[in-house]
C-alpha cells in the first residue's frame, strides 16, 4: 500500500526534498482535495525551514491514508525524477516501493513487554516516529474504570487547548544554543498532534518571558480547555531560566521558577483551576557533571539532599499559607526538568537536546496507554545508565491529585 511505502521513505524525503517540490506537492494535494486551504497554509506559515515544511507535509499526508499517499508519490515521480530516484519511488501502485519499509520496521525494536502486556488492544500500528493513538475501546474503558482517579478531558469539538513554547537561542553574553531549532520543531509537532494550539516565543529577556507568560495565562481559551503545556528552552542556572541578556558578572536576567508557578496558580489563573499544568524545562541547573566515580568511602554527595531539605521546608511553609484559602493556591502542577539541581543538560548540535529527543520519543510510544507521570518515568529510565554524557531528568513540584491521561486521538 502507498501509505506503508511512504512511511518507509519519510526520513529520507525530509532530508532530500527541495522547496520547489514542496510547493508543487502542496498545490497538487490542494487541487486533488487531499489538503484544504487551512492545512496548506499551516504547512507554509507555521514552519520556518524546508525540512520543517517537508516534515509537516508528509505527516499530514500519511494521516490521510493510501489514496493521498499515492497522489503524493505520483507527483514526485512525474515532477521530480531525481528525488524519485533518490527515494526509490515508482508511480505504479504495484511496484516494489515498499522494500525499505520492512528494513525500517526491522531497524526499530518492538515496545517493551510492559507495554505489550497492558490490558486492552495491542499496540496501535503507527510509524516509529509518529504519535500512537489511543484505541477508542481503551479510552472508554479507562474513563469508566478510573473516573474518580483521572483528570477529565473535554470533547475535541468543544475544547481549546493551548501550549506555549519559549526558546532562547542567541544571547548577548552566553554561547549560541545550536540545535535548539530542532527541539522547537519537535515539541511543536508533538503538542500539535496531542491537540494543542502551540504558540512559540523566541529570544526573550526575563522581563519579556514574564510578560508573555502573564498574557498567555490571561487567554480566554483556557476556560474551555482541559490542560496546558509550558515548555522552556534556554540556558539556565539553579534558580531559573536565563534571558537573552544574562551575564554572570552583570545583568541577572533570570526568570525565577517561582514566578512561573505564581502566574499560573489558582490565585492568578482561575481559568486553569483543577486542570493539569505541565511545565517542561530544557536548561542547565548548574555547572556540575551529573556523574561520579563510586568508591568505598562512606562520604556521600550532599548537593541533592540539601536541595531536598530546602524543598521540604518550602512545602511546609506553603501548607500553612494555604490554610487561609478555600482552594489550594498551587495545585495540579507537574514540572519535568532536564537534569537534577546543580547539574548540566546536554544538547547535540545536530540532533537537538538529549532530554527533548527522549521526551518526544516516549510521548509518541507510551502516551496512548500510560498517564503522564509514567511517560515521564520512561524518559528517566532511558537516562538510567549514564552514556557518554550523564544527566537525570527530574519530576519536581508535583501537585497533581489525579492521573493525567492525554488519550491521543480523542
Swiss-Prot record:
Residues 1-119, 297-322 form a propeptide. PANTHER family: CASPASE RECRUITMENT DOMAIN-CONTAINING PROTEIN 18, CASPASE-1. It comes from the Eukaryota. It is an enzyme of class 3 (hydrolase). This is Caspase-1. Thiol protease involved in a variety of inflammatory processes by proteolytically cleaving other proteins, such as the precursors of the inflammatory cytokines interleukin-1 beta (IL1B) and interleukin 18 (IL18) as well as the pyroptosis inducer Gasdermin-D (GSDMD), into active mature peptides. Keywords: Apoptosis, Cell membrane, Cytoplasm, Hydrolase, Membrane, Protease, Thiol protease, Ubl conjugation, Zymogen. One of its GO terms (cellular component) is NLRP3 inflammasome complex. The keyword Transport does not apply. It catalyses: Strict requirement for an Asp residue at position P1 and has a preferred cleavage sequence of Tyr-Val-Ala-Asp-|-. One of its GO terms (molecular function) is cysteine-type endopeptidase activity. GO terms for biological process: apoptotic process; positive regulation of cytokine production; positive regulation of interleukin-1 beta production; protein autoprocessing; pyroptotic inflammatory response; regulation of apoptotic process; regulation of inflammatory response. It is found in: Cytoplasm; Cell membrane. It comes from Felis catus. Residues 88-104 have a biased composition (Polar residues). Heterotetramer that consists of two anti-parallel arranged heterodimers, each one formed by a 20 kDa (Caspase-1 subunit p20) and a 10 kDa (Caspase-1 subunit p10) subunit. May be a component of the inflammasome, a protein complex which also includes PYCARD, CARD8 and NLRP2 and whose function would be the activation of pro-inflammatory caspases. Component of the AIM2 PANoptosome complex, a multiprotein complex that drives inflammatory cell death (PANoptosis). Both the p10 and p20 subunits interact with MEFV. Interacts with CARD17P/INCA and CARD18. Its EC number is 3.4.22.36. Residues 88-125 are annotated as: Disordered. Belongs to the peptidase C14A family. The two subunits are derived from the precursor sequence by an autocatalytic mechanism. Ubiquitinated via 'Lys-11'-linked polyubiquitination. Deubiquitinated by USP8.
Amino acid at each position: 500500500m502507498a501509505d506503508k511505502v511512504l512511511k518507509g521513505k519519510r526520513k529520507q524525503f525530509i532530508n532530500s526534498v527541495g522547496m520547489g517540490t514542496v510547493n508543487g506537492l502542496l498545490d497538487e494535494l490542494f487541487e486533488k482535495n487531499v489538503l484544504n486551504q487551512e492545512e496548506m497554509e499551516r504547512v507554509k506559515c507555521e514552519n520556518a525551514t524546508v525540512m520543517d515544511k517537508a516534515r509537516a507535509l508528509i505527516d499530514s499526508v500519511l494521516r490521510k491514508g493510501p489514496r493521498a499517499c499515492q497522489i503524493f508519490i505520483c507527483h514526485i515521480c512525474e515532477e521530480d525524477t531525481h528525488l524519485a530516484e533518490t527515494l526509490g519511488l515508482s508511480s505504479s501502485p504495484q511496484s516494489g516501493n515498499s522494500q525499505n519499509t520492512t528494513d525500517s520496521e526491522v531497524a526499530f525494536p518492538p515496545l517493551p513487554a510492559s507495554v505489550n502486556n497492558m490490558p486492552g488492544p495491542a499496540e496501535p500500528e503507527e510509524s516509529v516516529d509518529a504519535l500512537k493513538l489511543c484505541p477508542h475501546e481503551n479510552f472508554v474503558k479507562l474513563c469508566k474504570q478510573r473516573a474518580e482517579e483521572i483528570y477529565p478531558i473535554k470533547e475535541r469539538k468543544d475544547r481549546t487547548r493551548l501550549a506555549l513554547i519559549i526558546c532562547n537561542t542567541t544571547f548577548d553574553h552566553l554561547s549560541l544554543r545550536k540545535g535548539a531549532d530542532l527541539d522547537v520543531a519537535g515539541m511543536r509537532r508533538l503538542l500539535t498532534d496531542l491537540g494543542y494550539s502551540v504558540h512559540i516565543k523566541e529570544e526573550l529577556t526575563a522581563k519579556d518571558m514574564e510578560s508573555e507568560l502573564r498574557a498567555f495565562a490571561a487567554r480566554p481559551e483556557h476556560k474551555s480547555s482541559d490542560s496546558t503545556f509550558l515548555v522552556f528552552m534556554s540556558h539556565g542556572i539553579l534558580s531559573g531560566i536565563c534571558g537573552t541578556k544574562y551575564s554572570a558578572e552583570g545583568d541577572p536576567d533570570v526568570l525565577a521558577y517561582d514566578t512561573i508557578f505564581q502566574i499560573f496558580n489558582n490565585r492568578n489563573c482561575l481559568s486553569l483551576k483543577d486542570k493539569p499544568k505541565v511545565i517542561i524545562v530544557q536548561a542547565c541547573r548548574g555547572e556540575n557533571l551529573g556523574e561520579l566515580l563510586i568508591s568505598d568511602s562512606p562520604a556521600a554527595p550532599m548537593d541533592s539532599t540539601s536541595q531536598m531539605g530546602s524543598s521540604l521546608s518550602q512545602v511546609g511553609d506553603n501548607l500553612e499559607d494555604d490554610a487561609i484559602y478555600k482552594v489550594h493556591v498551587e495545585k495540579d502542577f507537574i514540572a519535568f526538568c532536564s537534569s537534577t539541581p546543580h547539574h548540566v543538560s546536554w544538547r547535540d548540535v545536530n540532533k537537538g537536546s538529549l532530554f527533548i529527543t527522549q521526551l518526544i520519543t516516549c510521548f509518541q510510544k507510551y502516551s496512548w496507554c500510560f498517564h503522564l507521570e509514567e511517560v515521564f518515568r520512561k524518559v528517566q529510565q532511558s537516562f538510567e545508565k549514564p552514556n557518554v554524557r550523564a544527566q537525570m531528568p527530574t519530576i519536581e513540584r508535583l501537585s497533581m491529585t489525579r492521573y493525567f491521561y492525554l488519550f491521543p486521538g480523542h
